A protein has these predicted regions:
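A charged, aromatic-enriched C-terminal amphipathic alpha-helix characteristic of glycosyltransferases
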Residues: 17, 257, 273-303, 310-314, ...
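Donor nucleotide-sugar binding/catalytic pocket of nucleotide-sugar-dependent glycosyltransferases
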Residues: 109-141, 157
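Conserved catalytic-core segment of nucleotide-activated headgroup transferases in glycan assembly
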Residues: 138-189, 195
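Conserved acidic donor-binding segment of nucleotide-sugar-dependent glycosyltransferases
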Residues: 154, 251-259, 268-273
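Short hydrophobic beta-strand element within catalytic cores of glycosyltransferases
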Residues: 234-237
Length: 319
């Protein structure tokens, strides 16, 4: 099957969770024999990443569209994709619960992929759909944790102010802040805070992390929580609908405004017994989130919407 993506950004140039969602899914598609191309609006130099062909901006947009059996898109490229593609099925990956009227208006052509069951409940579309949480290769992200308390993406919505307040209140703890790929990054100089630039390989961050903080105002899933749990790193987070479904009972939930509660949970994890217990729960939850079965089911869904025959004897590995 020929699969085409029409989106704005793609790894390794982008480290956004939505773009890594696309790449992890594409790695699976390649592993089971599909051909995958990614068409970026501003890309002038083609490259190949894990078997995924990222093509240069075409002179004629119709050529890659004619090649494809199905076209994937997400976020702000959705209206443009629907306008460009008239006779092929479109798969729209839903990364948030903001309403996309273009998707509703094209309910017969556009298939919806929700990133969580909770998101589907919050904003239901009449389109044919599938629920596929962000696929994370658990083995790839498994590292030996370090000794920092970490926040990834230092913007206000991700909880940068909470992060710095905790660092001020806990001067004997080491904090690690990692700049994100989007949003205004809030950088403050504190003696116990180290700031890193945006990382191309986020595993280097997890190698230095003992506790991951996610004091987010909004998360429809929260991919970094899954990545951290793969290494048994406890996640202290806000109780958003996405993080609750993602972390399950392994998450340590705090109200974003209750700073003292965050301090208490961090202090609790300083105990060896408490940390080991939380780490085991995190690893267990990560194992439950292995995407292999869901990806196989999703591939059958794609065969269904493209009216292609599904081969039950092919390779089923995701990597």
């Amino acid at each position: 099957m020929n699969i085409l993506w029409h989106i704005r950004f793609y790894p390794p140039g982008s480290n956004c969770g939505s773009d890594w969602y696309a790449h992890e899914l594409n790695k699976f598609f390649v592993s089971v024999g599909h051909s995958v191309k990614v068409m970026l609006s501003e890309n002038d130099a083609p490259y190949n990443l894990d078997g995924v062909e990222v093509i240069a901006k075409p002179v004629n947009w119709g050529d890659p569209i004619s090649w494809a059996d199905v076209i994937f898109t997400h976020l702000d490229f959705t209206p443009n994709t629907c306008q460009m593609v008239q006779r092929k099925p479109i798969v729209w990956i839903m990364h948030n619960t903001f309403d996309y009227s273009t998707v509703r208006r094209n309910k017969d052509r556009v298939k919806v992929v929700y990133n969580s069951e909770a998101a589907k409940e919050q904003i239901w579309y009449p389109n044919e759909s599938f629920v596929l949480p962000p696929p994370v290769d658990i083995d790839y992200y498994r590292v030996t944790p370090g000794d920092y308390i970490t926040l990834i993406n230092l913007n206000e919505a991700k909880g940068a102010e909470v992060f710095y307040k905790l660092a001020e209140l806990m001067p004997n703890q080491k904090f690690l802040g990692v700049k994100g790929s989007y949003g205004k990054q809030i950088v403050k100089k504190l003696p116990n805070v180290e700031i890193l630039e945006t990382q191309r390989d986020i595993r280097e961050v997890y190698k230095r992390t003992r506790i991951l903080l996610m004091p987010s105002a909004y998360e429809s899933w929260g991919r970094t929580a899954t990545e951290a749990m793969a290494s048994g790193i406890p996640v202290i987070c806000t109780d958003t609908f996405g993080l609750r479904e993602n972390c399950g009972d392994a998450g340590i939930y705090c109200d974003r405004k209750d700073i003292q509660k965050w301090v208490e949970m961090i202090e609790k994890l300083q105990g060896k017994k408490e940390y080991i217990a939380a780490s085991k729960k995190a690893r267990k939850r990560a194992e439950q989130l292995r995407p292999d079965t869901k990806l196989e089911q999703f591939d059958k869904f794609i065969h269904h919407i493209t009216k292609k025959e599904y081969d039950t004897n092919r390779n089923k590995s995701i990597s």
